[in-house]
């Protein structure tokens, strides 16, 4: 009887050790859970960025306003009936 209690005690200790400290145990589970949360948050940010880029691409393909806005901001272009004034600071 005493041998059986010792055997089951050691068996319980072995399983508890492997659960808490062993490979694929509690620590690995917690680390994997944190990694999944981090990657999920990163995916949400990337999806939002992709939606903005897709909307901008769609606007550039179908609309004239976005193309005109890009020409004005990036290339400093003006229409034929407009005047462009550049104010240069005194440094």
Swiss-Prot record:
Main location: membrane
Transmembrane helix in keyword set: yes
Topological domain ranges for the Cytoplasmic compartment: 1-3
GO cellular component: cell division site; cell septum; plasma membrane
Keywords noted in UniProt: Cell cycle, Cell division, Cell inner membrane, Cell membrane, Coiled coil, Membrane, Transmembrane, Transmembrane helix
Transmembrane residue ranges: 4-21
An example Gene Ontology biological process: FtsZ-dependent cytokinesis
4Fe-4S is among the record's keywords: no
Membrane-protein topology: Single-pass type II membrane protein
Coiled coil: 27-76
Segments in the Periplasmic topological domain: 22-91
Localization annotation: Cell inner membrane
Family: Belongs to the FtsB family.
Classification via HAMAP family: FtsB
Main function: Essential cell division protein. May link together the upstream cell division proteins, which are predominantly cytoplasmic, with the downstream cell division proteins, which are predominantly periplasmic.
Protein name as catalogued: Cell division protein FtsB
Organism this protein belongs to: Haemophilus ducreyi (strain 35000HP / ATCC 700724)
Encoding gene (name): ftsB
